[in-house]
Swiss-Prot record:
PROSITE patterns: GTP_CYCLOHYDROL_1_1, GTP_CYCLOHYDROL_1_2. The keyword Transcription does not apply. The lineage of its organism: Bacteria, Bacillati, Cyanobacteriota, Cyanophyceae, Synechococcales. Its EC number is 3.5.4.16. This is GTP cyclohydrolase 1.
Length: 229
């Protein structure tokens, strides 16, 4: 039998605690670096601006929980506004095809999030996008990418809806485009009137979707139909 030296158990527990604390600190540092991402998002002016905002609300940017917050906010804003650094040409990358299809193509329930340009608070929802091709069709994923590109900018929902429709008209020259967006706005939920559960619905109808009531009704009927998935 091995006899433990007096106090050795206490020392062992202290060593274990020190090791655990060191590991937690390392894990937090690793998590922070991963959250910031590997791409270079450093922007001293933006970081300084976030620090100024933190001081303005009475916080200390140098306290432990906030030391990396300015960099994280800058990284998040760059991601949420990445649509400014994209173009339709690069996005589509020649994914337009001659198919001779002339019936409605509908991509519904495309999830989206964007930042309201008035308060920089998010609005979150889904888009339904349809078009009737003359000759050219586009890969379905590219429609979702177009929604994403315009969403990742400072926006108002009305303009976002119109921009998606105009983009498809520009690249496909179809008989028409219909876009409906349903979204809930945090600027109405977290502040102001504070109405949780309210939704804003906007539409943009171009070409036959505006001119032909039957085409418009077919589109609206299809997006009202419950999904089977």
């Amino acid at each position: 039998m091995t006899l433990a030296k007096p106090g050795s158990g206490s020392q062992s527990r202290m060593d274990d605690k020190a090791h655990f604390k060191s590991r937690v600190i390392r894990d937090r540092a690793t998590f922070a670096e991963e959250e910031l991402g590997s791409s270079d998002v450093s922007d001293p002016a933006m970081v300084a601006a976030v620090e100024t905002l933190l001081r303005g609300i009475g916080e200390d940017p140098q306290r432990e929980g906030l030391r990396k917050t300015p960099e994280r906010v800058v990284a998040a804003l760059k991601f949420l506004t990445s649509g400014y650094r994209q173009s339709l040409e690069e996005l589509l990358n020649s994914a337009i095809f001659d198919e001779g299809h002339d019936e409605m193509v509908l991509l519904r329930d495309v999830s989206l999030f964007s930042l309201c340009e008035h308060h920089l608070l998010p609005f979150i929802g889904k888009a339904h996008v349809a078009y009737i091709p003359k000759q050219k069709v586009v890969g379905l994923s590219k429609i979702a990418r177009i929604v994403e590109m315009y969403s990742r900018r400072l926006q108002v929902q009305e303009r976002l809806t119109r921009q998606i429709a105009e983009a498809l008209m520009e690249v496909l020259d179809p008989y028409g485009v219909g876009v409906v967006i349903e979204a809930t706005h945090m600027c109405m939920v977290m502040r102001g009137v504070q109405k949780a559960g309210s939704w804003t619905v906007t539409s943009s109808m171009v070409g036959v979707f505006q001119e032909d009531p039957r085409t418009r009704e077919e589109f609206l009927s299809l997006i009202r139909h419950p999904s089977n998935f």
